[in-house]
Amino acid sequence: MVKVYAPASSANMSVGFDVLGAAVIPVDGALLGDVVTVEAAETFGLNNLGRFADKLPSEPRENIVYQCWERFCQELGKQIPVAMTLEKNMPIGSGLGSSACSVVAALMAMNEHCGKPLNDTRLLALMGELEGRISGSIHYDNVAPCFLGGMQLMIEENDIISQQVPGFDEWLWVLAYPGIKVSTAEARAILPAQYRRQDCIAHGRHLAGFIHACYSRQPELAAKLMKDVIAEPYRERLLPGFRQARQAVAEIGAVASGISGSGPTLFALCDKPDTAQRVADWLGKNYLQNQEGFVHICRLDTAGARVLEN
C-alpha cells in the first residue's frame, strides 16, 4: 500500500499571475491537503472519503483521480489494477489548489506503487495536463508547488517546468476560505482579453522586482511588490467583502494580501506571529460566510507532496 499526501497551495501570489505558486502547511501541524492511497487489486476501484467527498462527481469516470489512473496506465502502455482511495480534505473551487492536491497525490501514488517508472519532470507534465482538464487550461502554478514544495516560478523552457524561488522564513500566510465556491473557469472568463501598456509594464516591474527581492533577501521590498494589476481588479467583484477585508488586514499589520488562486480564499502575509493571529481572528469573524469556511495560519511547505506510508 502507498499513501501520499499533497499540500494546499496558493497560486499567483498577487504578483505572479499563472507563473508563481507556493505550497503551504498550517503552523499547528494540521495537514491541509488531500491524501490518496493505492493498493494492488484484481480490478480498478475508487473510494471517496473526507470532509468534502460529498462535493465530488457522482459518476466515477468524472472523478479526476479516476482520470489520473487512466492517463497513467496509458503512459505506461498497460492496465494497472489497483484500489484507490481519495481522502478529499480540500474544498472544491476554493483557490487553494484543491484539484491539484488530488491530481498530485494520485499520480505520485501511482508512480510510487509502480516503482517510479516516470521521473519528476514527466510526472509534473502529466499533473499539469490532468489539472488543466478541470481548470480549462494547462498551467502549473498549483501542481508545481504542491508536488515539489516551496515557492515555485514557472519557467517552461529548456525542459524545465518550474524552479524554486527562496522564500522568507518569517512570513506567515493567513489563509481564509469563506465557504463559497468560485470556479476557476468563471474567474478566468471575467478577465479582459487585452491589457493597457502601462499595466503590462507595471506587472513586469512588480514580478521582476519581487523575484529580485527574494534572491537579495529583502522581505519588506518583496511584500511591497506583491501587487496585482492583471486579475484582482476584475475578480474582486466575485468575492463578497474582499475589499473591506484587505483594508482591515492591512490596518492590523499584514505586509501584503490578495486573492489566493482564483478565489474566494484570501491570503494575508504577516511577519509577526501575534499579527498573524489578530488577522486570523478578524477574518474568522468577518470574512467567513458559512460553516464550511475556515482560517489557517500557515508557513511555506518546503517538502511538497510526500509518502505517508509505503
UniProtKB/Swiss-Prot annotation:
Please list the reactions this protein catalyses: L-homoserine + ATP = O-phospho-L-homoserine + ADP + H(+)
Which Pfam families does the protein's record reference? GHMP_kinases_C, GHMP_kinases_N
- On whether Methyltransferase is a keyword of this UniProt record, the answer is no
Check the record and name the Gene3D superfamilies matching this protein. Answer: 3.30.230.10, GHMP kinase, C-terminal domain
Any idea which UniProt keywords this protein has?
A: Amino-acid biosynthesis, ATP-binding, Cytoplasm, Kinase, Nucleotide-binding, Threonine biosynthesis, Transferase
**What transmembrane ranges does the database entry give?**
none
Main localisation, per the record? Answer: cytoplasm
Q: Where in the cell is it found?
A: Cytoplasm
Binding residue positions for ATP? 91-101
Q: Could you say which EC number(s) this protein's record lists?
A: 2.7.1.39
| Record-level GO cellular component terms | cytoplasm
A Gene Ontology molecular-function term?
A: homoserine kinase activity
Q: Which GO terms describe its biological process?
A: threonine biosynthetic process
User: InterPro entries attached here?
Assistant: GHMP_kinase_C_dom, GHMP_kinase_C_sf, GHMP_kinase_N_dom, GHMP_knse_ATP-bd_CS, Homoserine_kinase, Ribosomal_Su5_D2-typ_SF, Ribsml_uS5_D2-typ_fold_subgr
Q: Under which pathway is this protein filed? A: Amino-acid biosynthesis; L-threonine biosynthesis; L-threonine from L-aspartate: step 4/5
Tell me its family: Belongs to the GHMP kinase family. Homoserine kinase subfamily.
Q: Which NCBIfam families match?
A: PRK01212.1-4 (NF002288), thrB (TIGR00191)
Job description of the protein? Catalyzes the ATP-dependent phosphorylation of L-homoserine to L-homoserine phosphate.
Name-wise, this protein is Homoserine kinase
Organism encoding this protein: Escherichia coli (strain SE11)
